[in-house]
């Protein structure tokens, strides 16, 4: 593993060439004290502000820098093919479009769209995927058939690290979607006993929330894939007016359950600072208005059911390895065992920068429920049906 300070030293010199004009520490804009940083890229073709979080400031600053670099790399994805799925699949391996996250717009296998070639990590063969779920140049018109966003876009010090991060993000988004579709009672039954959390880093983060008078609720949302995933909800105990009650969420996934929970805890703090700063281009004014009554009721009911503490931290599956390659192999085997047939990686690394960046596509997993065009897929619909 490479220390964040080493990563920063290696890649920060490329910041100006990637259009990153500012890298700042915004931790002090909130009282929690969990490090959060921002990288600003004004001419971005997607969002101009990227954020990072971590256990310490170097980790957060490096995280923000790398997220901004991912967006830059995904804006220029190289040459692809403009053809129909029928023609492409007759001569090449192509993903089953029925398994991709749809926007609801009917896909015609005879209509030409742009495709990019990737490599299937499970079948060890080339495989083509729709370009609109790879690139992030949203100044260009999208085909509009599939959910386009940053899900599955990741970077790292090594290709294996980038691939592992991308896969974990996709599994995390799938887990959150499946859990969210389950209904309030089923969700509450996945609550995590905070007292059972014995990892020192997690305890230190929980102490920061406690010192700041911030309530924390946790859920174990690990799915049949078997890679640890958590959701963290935070709310301000100093708020006395119900109409001002705000909840901020974070999620995390990693083979090592402690790292997964650290990611969820730090992301919740990052989300809260996102709303405090208002820096994200994709934040809408409606998100600052009063929360709907139904959301407040759900939050209160969940809080009451939190007392059941049905899941213990040590019971969550974990896999700790010192080698990133082992993490990656474990993730792929878990996906295969869960019935996933393809894990396609498109390498976006540029020789002139040397920063490993990938986009991973896993047909069959749920997408990001926060995406405005998200529609529940098979896994979410199944979870909803089982919870009725």
Residue ranges and their predicted role:
Residues 1-388:
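Helix-biased "structured C-terminal domain" signature
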